[in-house]
Amino acid sequence: MTARRLAAGIAILGAVLAVWLARPARFVVDGLSMAPGLMPGDLVSTGWLPAADRLHGPARFERWLVTAPDGTRAVKRIGGLPSEAVSIRDGDLVVGGTTVLKGPSVLAGVAVPLAAAVDPPRGHAMLPADEILDDVAFAREVNRTLETVRDAGLVARLVTGTAAAGLRATVGGATIRWRLPAAAAVRLIAGRLDGRLVAVAWRDHAARAADDLRSGLPARVPEAWSVATEWPVGPGEADQPPCSIAIAVAGDARIERAAGWRDVHLRPAADGVASWQLDANSWLVLGDFPTGSIDSRRWGPLPTAAFRCRIGRP
């Protein structure tokens, strides 16, 4: 074989390998385990490098297409990484004794929308419920005992006039204030999440409000919280939901739209197991709708070989 033919053969082999690496995987969602972000019948795609995904490996809170122990395929979210001590406590994910904080983009994929009371003339919006339960409109027929959710908040779009204005967000005993620029649209997310007081506000450059995700949160959010303070922020709040959640504007501004949200409320396994010590080749995967998901709480941790490809954000 001449050097030219060898080079041509290597080039062809490389092209075939590139096509194989770039094959997008498509999967039709079956079931409610990843609701509300993914609903039955949704078609999800991994993009163009699923094999490269496997080489890179999963990261916490990413959604992956996995092979279950019975050989079926399912989409799940990464909860625990190899060699970690992982547990579920009060509905939250705890790793090494510390509650893991979700970023805004993860919250946008897992949150469940709630109704908010909005008073545009007064520039005020609030989450009126004294108790928030892990109920969902998309699975009312699922027979389960509801539990109290401690993590909830508000999302809003505010519009200012020709003058700068002020914004105040109140969560439990804490108040966060922002100065709003003139002639601007501003998005806000604020509430209690994973044992923290969280908030982020950013300028929305769209001419009009973009469609939100099924969670009720914007499809595009910042990567990190601008406020992430340990809870409790006031006396007597350690074990109680932040029942008082409100936002208010002052000056030349109005609340264009507002809604409530609650976080996913994790539950232990059916047999009561709520903690796992992962070995060097094990991962804990969970569903976004815990009472409708079969995941590591039943299967146990999954080996690295079970992960097929990453599902797009959030």
Question: What residue ranges belong to the model's regions?
Answer:
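Extended hydrophobic leader/signal-anchor segments used for secretion and membrane insertion
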Residues: M1-P314
